[in-house]
A protein has these predicted regions:
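Ubiquitin-like/PB1-type beta-grasp interaction modules and other compact soluble beta-rich domains
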Residues: 1-95
Length: 96
């Protein structure tokens, strides 16, 4: 992944890795902040139909390099992404 520019004012950067990059055909994209983690997942499902089941349900998430818990029930309203944050979607990687 190349260097990611700062997000525009009022936004955060969402970084995609591995299967998330393949699914979205993007390395990153800026999204409006603030946004709860639950709303982020809903927004991604609206933009990329099927991403929740194919990628998000088995991925790890970081905010500013700190791992955050992603509840299995899809909640996550208490985790709020702020302007300028860097969020990463990290799917499992298999080795062989």
């Amino acid at each position: 992944m190349a260097s990611v520019p700062k997000p525009p004012k009022g936004h955060f950067n969402l970084l995609y890795f591995a299967g998330a990059t393949s699914f979205t055909h993007k390395d990153y994209e800026p999204l409006p902040a603030p946004l709860s983690l639950a709303k982020l997942f809903a927004e991604l499902e609206a933009r990329y139909t099927g991403i929740r089941a194919a990628v998000l349900d088995t991925s790890l998430v970081t905010i500013n390099l700190d791992y955050v818990d992603v509840p299995a029930d899809g909640s996550g309203h208490d985790v709020v992404i702020q302007e300028g944050d860097e969020v990463a979607i990290i799917p499992p990687v298999s080795s062989g």
